[in-house]
Amino acid sequence: MEMDGDPYNLPAQGQGNIIITKYEQGHRAGAAVDLGHEQVDVRKYTNNLGIVHEMELPHVSALEVKQRRKESKRTNKWQKMLADWTKYRSTKKLSQRVYKVIPLAVRGRAWSLLLDIDRIKSQNPGKYKVMKEKGKRSSRIIHCIQLDVSHTLQKHMMFIQRFGVKQQELCDILVAYSAYNPEVGYHRDLSRITAILLLCLPEEDAFWALTQLLAGERHSLWYSTAQILPGSRGSYRTRSRCCTSPSQRS
């Protein structure tokens, strides 16, 4: 199929096929990232959270050095706790450490254990792949998703490339979830929540983390369908805090 035409002038199914093909082919199939005419070391423009700034960042301050040392000590404490998860999983100490912010180095593992991702994956072998393929049949949803994906965390180094790896994973998860939970389908708030999960989790793990947050026994009251669909600013702040209080406050 010719890829150079405008996909939005094609019938719905044609639009969906072209969008999916662009993501599958990766960044080279899409628009180039504008980094200027000269090659630059992007690390000089990227902060510790992965946000790419327009200007080169100043050298690390004494305060930042102190904060990093503190983060390292907290990471060691978390590593010991994660290694003995059965002992700590339902304790007050765990809750306190979560609200103090989970260190970035162990955040993915902590989220995985908190959301019981390994268990839900083992109970649903191959389910994510099936849902991903099923979701790709809905061109209307794919069109909505790709518009939001292109504007999600677009200044973060993992999502800065149009049709890059992380944008592809984000699109795939949202497409799969729309098929997995048709009652919710797709809502634009899901794009940012899922992208934050992808910062610390592999693709399939991020999918199951999303399902646990939206429908798991422990979290379903926070992420009911009624809360998500209105998309109000207040309910979005509540959902973001429940989902990502560690990363949003780091």
From Swiss-Prot:
Molecular functions per Gene Ontology: GTPase activator activity
InterPro entries: Rab-GAP-TBC_dom, Rab-GAP_TBC_sf, Rab_GAP_TBC_domain
Gene3D superfamilies from the UniProt entry: putative rabgap domain of human tbc1 domain family member 14 like domains (1.10.8.270), Ypt/Rab-GAP domain of gyp1p, domain 1 (1.10.10.750)
Any Pfam family matching the protein: RabGAP-TBC
The entry's keywords: GTPase activation
Domain Rab-GAP TBC: 101-250
Source species, domain of life: Eukaryota
Role: May act as a GTPase-activating protein for Rab family protein(s).
Protein name: TBC1 domain family member 26
UniProt source species: Homo sapiens (Human)
The organism's taxonomic lineage, starting at the top: Eukaryota, Metazoa, Chordata, Craniata, Vertebrata
Protein encoded by which gene: TBC1D26
